[in-house]
Structure formats: C-alpha cells, structure tokens
Amino acid sequence: MSKKIQPSKKIHSLEDARKLAKKRLPKMFFDFVDGAAGDEKLCELNSTALDQIRLEPKVLRNVEKRSLSKKFFGINYNLPFGFAPMGMCDLTWPGADKMLANESLINNIPACVSMASTTSLEKMYELTEGRSWLQLYIFQDEKFVMELIDRAKKTGYKTLVLTVDVPIQFRRAKDDKNGFTVPFKIGPKQFFDFATHPNWSISTLFNGIPKPMNYETSKNGNKFVRSESRGSTDWETLKRIRNAWDGKLVVKGVMSQQDALKIKDEGADAIQVSNHGGRQLESATSAINALPLIRETLGKEFPLIFDSGVRSGGDIVRALAFGADYVMIGRPLMYAIGADGARGLRKIIEIIIGELSTTLGLVGLTDINEITSDIVAQKYFKDMKY
C-alpha cells in the first residue's frame, strides 16, 4: 500500500534540490551523485543538447484536458517516464530505495532496480507491487548474474535491463579525490566529512550503513566490488542472457546505430539509448543526438527508451519528439532525496509532472501519445519525422 507524502516546502526547482542536497550530504556522496566521467563535460552536454531543442508553440487549440498516460510493453502507465536504475541510493538518505518504490506505486510507473540496490530485488518488487524492472551488469563470473536472473523469475519480474556500456569504468575525478570506494574505506578525510554533516551521519548510523543487498542476500556469498572487470562481455554474452531470460529484455547503454541493429537482431525487446548520464566515455556525443539516428535505423515500431541529461518535463517531451517511446530519469531524484528525503522526492516529481503537462498543452496537444517531431521547430530538426 502506498504512503501519501506531503511535498517539500523547501524546493521550488531542480536547482533548489541540488543546492540543498549539496549542503545536506557529505561531500563524498553528493559528488558521487553529481559527478561524471573525466572533466564532466559530457554530463553538461547531455543537458545542454536537450535544452537547445526548441519547440513550436501552437495556439487556439482546446487543451483544457490533457492525458499523460503511456503504454509500454503492453502495460498502461500513468506517466511517460519511470525511474532509472541507480546503485547505492540509500547513500543519499536512509530509505531512498523505499521512497522510490512508494512513488512508483503512487504514480503507477516502473522503477528499475539496480543490481547494486541497497534494497533487495525481492523487497523492491513487493514494495512496488510488481512495477519493478531489474537491471544487471555482466561480470567475468556469470554465475551470480544467472543467480539474480533466477531470483527475478521466481519473484515475478517481467522486464530485465542489461547495461552494456561499462566494460571498463571510466575515471571519475571527484570519486578519486574523495576516496569513494565500495566497499567503503573510512580514513581521517572521510571521518571529517561525516562529522561535518551530522544529520546524515546520525540518520545513517541509526538505520545502518547501506549495503548492496542483492549481493548480501546471494546464496553464493558474492561481494560487490565497484571496480570489478566487465571487459569480457561480448555478443555471445548477450545471447546467453537472452536464452536465460524469457521475459522482456532491454539492452541499456546503446549509442551506435550499428550496435542497435545487431542488438535488435539478437532478440532484444527494446533498446535504451543512453551514455550512462555522462559517466562513461567522456568524448561521446550527447544521448539525445544519438536517439533520432537510432530511431531512423530501427524504424518506427521498435521500442526505444531514453535517458541521460533529462532534467525537466520539457526534456521528456523533447525526447519523445526525437523518437523515444519511454523516458527514464535518475539524477534529479537523487538530488531531491538528498535535499529533503521523501518530501523532496514528492515535490520534484510534482514539478516534473506539471512541466510535462504544461509543455504538452503549449505545443497544442492533449495526449502524450500525440507527440511527434512536428512539435519541434524545423530549424532544429530538419527532414526527420517520427
């Protein structure tokens, strides 16, 4: 049963949430949420590229009543966006995973559970009443992955998201500087960081140090090592996962038209166009620039999910106009939870929904499913029609 949460009175924009989270969280954990690969320019580019897409206002349409409902994988969701997989969420505030599950239930949208979630996949499925998807990485030892697939089947999961864009983890300067590792290593620098953020520290000590619970509950005693190699993953790996999983399979982290076509041919049910929020190859293009090219390659009917750089309801509309069928958001949720817990999360979701509905009406539409590239000013989107 969902729990009704009152929205935060401290937050009026995403930037408010980010600033409050920066004050409230230990630097080590705020930087983990806020940071990206290398010089972090790709993370900025993701958002800038979305913002540069200009929409064309339409007037004298009756847009008093508007619908945001979206069907994906045959399921009717109340909104065209869900929650991206995010590992170790409870570092932003105790119970963060459960807050996300509650909002998934309230809004009837999918919450993708990270392999490194601080709440077990079984518990998240229970809390979302079946709205969870499960995200996996592939490691050199696939036994644990197959164990999680088996657990997901037994629990009732219908959708598996396979992340393929981290064969090697790119350097993140802020994490290196702060000494952020999993498992945690606490030295004088980290101790001082925690001591100067007493609210977070006391709450975390009271609730227990967050752990990657899918590992903690493994029957084989697997331990999470953030730097563990995934470099051996190849097309044969994808085939094995496809053969092992009879539900819907989403392949996440695709930016190449050539890769997208092959992944489709290998039997994936959907592709998630993503550059990992700018946290992997720093010299990659923005994810929104790759989206229409992949849509053009795969045709109109193949399901595409989009993430990376989404910061507003307007960004969701832009992504849908550029060819996405569904959108996932991540970092804004962590800012909101870091800023004011469940109340912050409730408020930022309300803001995004409001922006989404307003943008839909201002481009002259009443149904989210009516969005096509026609709403994009042609200067920005010539000769592409989706």
Model region roles, listed by residue range:
Residues 1-51, 289-307, 311-386:
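Alpha/beta catalytic cores of nucleotide-metabolism and tRNA/nucleoside-modifying enzymes
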Residues 2-74, 183-233, 369-371, 377-386:
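An N-cap/entry alpha-helix motif that binds or orients negatively charged groups
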Residues 36, 114, 135, 252-253, ...:
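Active-site-adjacent beta-strand anchor residues
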Residues 54, 69-71, 80-84, 110-114, ...:
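Short, conserved beta-strand segments within well-ordered enzyme catalytic domains
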Residues 77-116, 121:
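Glycine-rich active-site/cofactor-binding loop and its immediate structural neighborhood
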Residues 82-88, 131-137, 219-224:
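Short, basic, glycine/proline-bearing loop/turn elements
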Residues 102, 140-306, 314-335:
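Alpha/beta enzyme core
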Residues 106-127, 131-145:
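A gly/proline- and charged-residue-enriched helix-loop-helix capping module
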